Design a protein with these regions (language model features):
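A glycine-rich, often tryptophan-bearing local segment used as a flexible ligand/cofactor-contacting loop or short
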Residues: 479-560
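Metal-dependent de-N-acetylase/amidase catalytic core
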Residues: 6, 34-51, 131-138, 142-308
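Catalytic beta-strand/loop cores that center a nucleophilic Ser/Cys/Thr
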Residues: 530-625, 640
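Extracellular ligand-binding/catalytic regions of CAZymes and related secreted enzymes
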Residues: 309-335, 341, 349, 423-427, ...
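Long beta-sheet-rich domains in secretory-pathway and surface-associated proteins
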Residues: 309-428
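Aromatic-Pro/Gly-enriched surface loop or interdomain linker
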Residues: 402-477, 508-510, 530-533, 619, ...
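Bacterial N-terminal signal peptides
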Residues: 15-31
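Active-site rim/loop-helix segments in enzyme catalytic domains that contact anionic ligands
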Residues: 34-156, 180, 184-191
Length: 641
């Protein structure tokens, strides 16, 4: 088994809409003088520069960055390939582009604490990827990725590049596919950035060939610590009364959407051991210093250059995101449908804004108002629109907000988002009365409200009372055993409910909050395994099970159109870890892999039934995928016994 020095490198980035598009980005290089922002170097003073390359927000080596900025006063750039928009959000319902906005804010807050300057390359975090091959394909090809990081190196002119990632592409030590691409392109860019024949169209305005002096990869496994010439960063040194580890800890806690704010001070030694680096490439032989990445590198004067706006500006001055992204078209036969929306606004101007907000349905404007937004970064506009009923299976509304004083603020302009209207042919048992143990995601609440499913949110008092028999099904939402400590406390009430004839549907949890406890009727051991290719075929192993028949017939077409991934955090297939009492109902795997058939488990317990699913069902239901909604309704419509 792979032995890692710290757990954070193994954190899973959840995915994005892989089946809807393949990101093929044409060459982004244009006249560097257009929309260019200056890169301020040290005003003619000799110096050295550090660059840290990371696939996603929170992948940066905060301790090393803080050491070199705070103790050594070295200019440091943090370059992120993505904004992490494909991940999970453990504090709210925001996903995809809006999650990327929030994670960018978190990253900038962390960089401010560390003392670095953050840049984003703009590649899409499309979800957890197992291979560099897939990541390169989704990011437009090897050269499209390489040329972009080469440009950043040429513009920012680092002497030393570090990364927590590497070039290993095979099991058992390979990282996330996005991480692999960072390592591979860092290695290749070391040479290409200095090659005057490689993409010479990048040159101009202070940007030209640049030779990096040293490239280091972080040592992540204890078995590699016995190598010669490793560099250990002395992060136990203090800056203004705090150790470098404490500064890095404070910065990491800014990544709230990834749950990092829950880190305890006692976790410090485990999360931030002394960073150890291995020299991968250098442009010449330098004297060795076991505590300094810059050993032997002489300070030099750098000319100030420019960066295109898309890389220099981490956050747009103004952006909007509409909720919900998908709304239900009502049954045919009505003349109009009414829809309710909330527009989340992100205002980074520091001033109140007056905006013209309007909504178009095709060529028809169905909403047009002026709204005042506060100076707060986040505000919202709540509105209702009425549109003629459509016979189409899908439709859309375009939301636009235009700041009325945009001319007074450079870079401030309109922002647009789209909401889709979909028709869904899924039924549920009208006798259903659902007890919902909610968490940070509101997808199930919105879905039940939209379809008219009768439900009640279960709070601590309701769980403690044990008076649960009035519910036909109790649903435990995603990561319930992390988010709801009362669920942990009163789990016996849930088991009693099943034993007395109830039906429980438990959505996925992660190993840290689940393993080592017996929350389910029979043992389930959760792993980090998943099926990330959402188009992979699904095999129904027990086609006679009523979960596939009542109240909806689950057909092969119902597995089409899924987004991001098939499943996540699969239970172990080993029957000594995940009991054989559970029926394995579905089989699916990524190409050339063999994942356990544990994405949908079903078992009888006493007079009731228990369902555990690691399917990424909430993403499908949020998008009103017809098959996803049908399966959800089947799970919750199983009768009490």
């Amino acid at each position: 088994m792979a032995e890692f020095l710290f757990d954070r490198m193994g954190c899973a980035k959840c995915g994005f809409v892989g089946s809807l598009l393949i990101i093929v980005i044409s060459s982004f290089f244009f006249n560097p003088s257009l929309s260019a922002h200056p890169i301020t170097q040290d005003a003619g003073k000799p110096g050295v520069v550090l660059m840290c390359l990371s696939a996603h927000p929170d992948d940066e080596d905060g301790a090393t960055i803080a050491y070199y900025t705070r103790i050594r006063h070295i200019k440091t750039y943090e370059t992120f390939y993505t904004r992490g928009e494909g991940g999970q959000n453990v504090i709210g319902p925001e996903l995809y582009r809006e999650l990327g906005e929030i994670r960018s804010e978190e990253t900038l807050a962390a960089a401010k604490i560390l003392g670095g300057k953050a840049y984003f390359l703009g590649f899409l975090d499309f979800g957890y990827s197992k291979t560099a091959k897939e990541t390169f394909r989704m990011w437009g090809g090897n050269d499209n990725v390489l040329q972009r990081i080469v440009y950043m190196i040429r513009a920012l002119q680092p002497d030393v590049i570090i990364t927590n990632h590497d070039t290993i592409t095979t099991l058992p030590y390979r990282q996330h596919g996005n991480h692999q691409v960072v390592g591979i392109t860092a290695y290749e860019a070391f040479t290409k950035a200095a090659d005057p024949t490689y993409h010479p169209e990048q040159f101009g305005n202070g940007v030209g060939p640049w030779q990096v002096k040293k490239l280091y990869f972080r040592v992540l496994r204890k078995s590699e610590l016995d190598q010669d010439s490793l560099v250990t960063i002395p992060v136990n040194m203090k800056y203004h009364g705090k150790t470098i580890q404490q500064i890095a800890w404070k910065a990491l806690k800014q990544h709230r959407t990834q749950g990092m704010d829950k880190l305890n001070f006692s976790d410090l030694p485990e999360v931030f051991p002394q960073p150890v680096y291995k020299l991968i490439l250098s442009d010449r032989k330098y004297p060795y210093n076991p505590n300094d990445l810059f050993s032997g590198i002489k300070p030099s004067v750098r000319p100030s250059g420019t960066l295109p706006e898309k890389y220099a500006v981490a956050l747009k001055p103004f952006s909007i995101f509409v909720h919900p992204k998908y709304s239900l078209l009502k049954a045919e036969g009505t003349s109009h449908d009414e829809f309710h929306f909330k527009i989340d606004t992100y205002n980074h101007t520091g001033s109140p804004l007056y905006v013209a907000a309007f909504v178009n349905h095709g060529r028809q404007r169905v909403f047009d108002e002026h709204e005042e937004l506060s100076r707060a970064i986040r505000d919202s506009i709540v509105l209702s629109v009425e549109v003629p009923s459509s016979s189409a299976a899908a439709d859309s509304l375009v939301f636009t907000c235009v700041p009325l004083d945009a001319k007074k603020m450079p870079g401030l302009g309109r922002s647009t988002d789209v909401a889709r209207l979909r028709r869904v042919t899924a039924g549920f048992d009208r006798k259903d009365y659902i007890g919902l143990v909610g968490t940070y995601d509101n997808t199930l609440e919105q879905t039940f409200d939209e379809f008219g499913v009768k439900y009640q949110l279960l709070d601590s008092a309701m769980l403690a009372s044990g008076k649960l028999n009035k519910y036909t099904t109790i649903v435990l939402d995603i990561r319930g055993y992390l988010y709801r400590r009362d669920l942990v406390r009163y789990d016996k009430r849930i088991l009693d409910y099943i034993r007395n004839g109830g039906n429980v549907v438990c959505f996925y949890n992660r190993p840290p909050e689940w393993n080592g406890h017996l929350y389910a009727p029979y043992p389930i051991e959760i792993t980090e395994h998943r099926v990330t290719e959402e188009t992979q075929p699904v095999t129904v192993l027990e086609p006679e099970n009523q979960l596939f028949h009542y109240p909806n017939e689950i057909l092969p077409v119902d597995w089409d159109g899924w987004v991001q991934e098939r499943n996540i955090y699969l239970p172990s297939g080993d029957t000594t870890l995940t009991s054989s009492r559970y029926h394995r109902l579905l089989a699916m795997s990524d190409e050339d892999q063999h994942e356990p058939s544990t994405s949908l488990l079903w078992a009888r317990y006493g007079r009731g039934t228990y369902i555990y699913t690691s399917l990424a069902l909430y993403r499908q239901v949020k998008d009103l995928n017809n098959g996803g909604v049908k399966l959800l309704f089947n799970l919750i419509s199983q009768p009490r016994h």
